[in-house]
Amino acid sequence: MTQPLFLIGPRGCGKTTVGMALADSLNRRFVDTDQWLQSQLNMTVAEIVEREEWAGFRARETAALEAVTAPSTVIATGGGIILTEFNRHFMQNNGIVVYLCAPVSVLVNRLQAAPEEDLRPTLTGKPLSEEVQEVLEERDALYREVAHIIIDATNEPSQVISEIRSALAQTINC
């Protein structure tokens, strides 16, 4: 199987952490769309949003998604990548989409443990727990709609990777 694997989900679900280890375990290349975009522009996500507003960032995010999609690649996407209909169809049609889902409490704990406010601008201006709850309520249906595989991401990364590998084996054998 050489199809790209797209990891989707909200901030804090482990897309980058799991993605790097998953790519290593599958002997694949790893790319994080936010990190790729930041390296191309030499700006943080917050700086891009400040300069170009969210609409400009979303357009650049789509371009990044297209640029990094390649065979034998694990791609960690930004949490809002699914907001653009093109991106949802692109990922569904060009690879296997894995939704790393986790409850709000887990997401908030992870985000508080590794705060990166300069890299992750607020979406609502509300306190973190309220923002995570609101954003997840808005996006969960889109994550589920686009996903080929849904994985509980509350476990340790090694367990999450094991579950992804198992689900991939079943997907390939169908």
From Swiss-Prot:
Record-stated family: Belongs to the shikimate kinase family. AroL subfamily.
Q: From which organism does this entry originate? A: Escherichia coli (strain K12)
Cell compartment(s), UniProt = Cytoplasm
Name the record gives this protein: Shikimate kinase 2
Q: Which residues bind ATP?
A: 12-17, 120
Query: What's the miscellaneous note?
Result: Two isozymes have been found in E.coli. AroK has 100-fold lower affinity for shikimate than AroL, suggesting that AroL is the dominant enzyme in the biosynthesis of the aromatic amino acids, with AroK playing a secondary role and possibly participating in an as yet unidentified cellular process.
Q: Which GO terms describe its cellular component?
A: cytosol
So which cofactors does this thing need? Mg(2+)
* Biological role: Catalyzes the specific phosphorylation of the 3-hydroxyl group of shikimic acid using ATP as a cosubstrate.
Q: Which PANTHER family does UniProt cross-reference here?
A: SHIKIMATE KINASE, SHIKIMATE KINASE 2
UniProt note: domains: The LID domain closes over the active site upon ATP binding.
Tell me which residues bind substrate: 34, 58, 79, 139
Q: Which GO terms describe its molecular function?
A: ATP binding; magnesium ion binding; metal ion binding; shikimate kinase activity
- According to the lineage, what is the superkingdom? Bacteria
What GO terms in the biological process aspect are recorded for it?
A: amino acid biosynthetic process; aromatic amino acid family biosynthetic process; chorismate biosynthetic process
List each coiled-coil range.
none
What keywords tag this UniProt record? Amino-acid biosynthesis, Aromatic amino acid biosynthesis, ATP-binding, Cytoplasm, Kinase, Magnesium, Metal-binding, Nucleotide-binding, Transferase
Report the catalytic activity. shikimate + ATP = 3-phosphoshikimate + ADP + H(+)
The EC number(s) this enzyme carries = 2.7.1.71
Q: Which residues bind Mg(2+)?
A: 16, 32
Which Gene3D superfamilies would you find in this protein's record?
P-loop containing nucleotide triphosphate hydrolases (3.40.50.300)
HAMAP family attached here? Shikimate_kinase, Shikimate_kinase_2
The entry describes its oligomerization and partners as:
Monomer.
